[in-house]
Curated annotation (Swiss-Prot):
Biological-process GO terms, alphabetical: translation
Primary site of residence: plastid
Official protein name in the record: Large ribosomal subunit protein bL35c
Keywords: Chloroplast, Plastid, Ribonucleoprotein, Ribosomal protein
Domain of life: Eukaryota
Subcellular location: Plastid, Chloroplast
GO MF annotation, one: structural constituent of ribosome
Family from the record: Belongs to the bacterial ribosomal protein bL35 family.
Cross-referenced InterPro entries: Ribosomal_bL35, Ribosomal_bL35-like, Ribosomal_bL35_CS, Ribosomal_bL35_sf
Any one GO CC term of the record: chloroplast
Organism, scientific name: Phaeodactylum tricornutum (strain CCAP 1055/1)
Keyword Endoplasmic reticulum among record annotations: no
NCBIfam families in the record: rpmI_bact
Length: 64
């Protein structure tokens, strides 16, 4: 059986936790930040868990 390939784009975006969840960063934090408040930018800097409906597809993209 051949080796499974990891989707490198997904590997850069998601990090697996110990309880088989995945962490991700918020969107809207890359550019156009002058119009956003400091509170909004601070909230967007935090990492959050991926929703349950997306975990199955991410596990297929990241087999290891």
């Amino acid at each position: 059986m051949p080796k499974l390939k990891t989707r490198k784009a997904a590997a850069k975006r998601y990090k697996r936790t110990g309880t088989s969840n995945f962490l991700r960063r918020h969107a809207f934090k890359g550019h156009l930040l002058m119009k956003k408040s400091n509170k909004q930018k601070r909230k967007l800097s935090q990492t959050i868990c991926v929703s349950r409906s997306d975990i199955k597809s991410i596990k297929l993209m990241l087999p290891y």
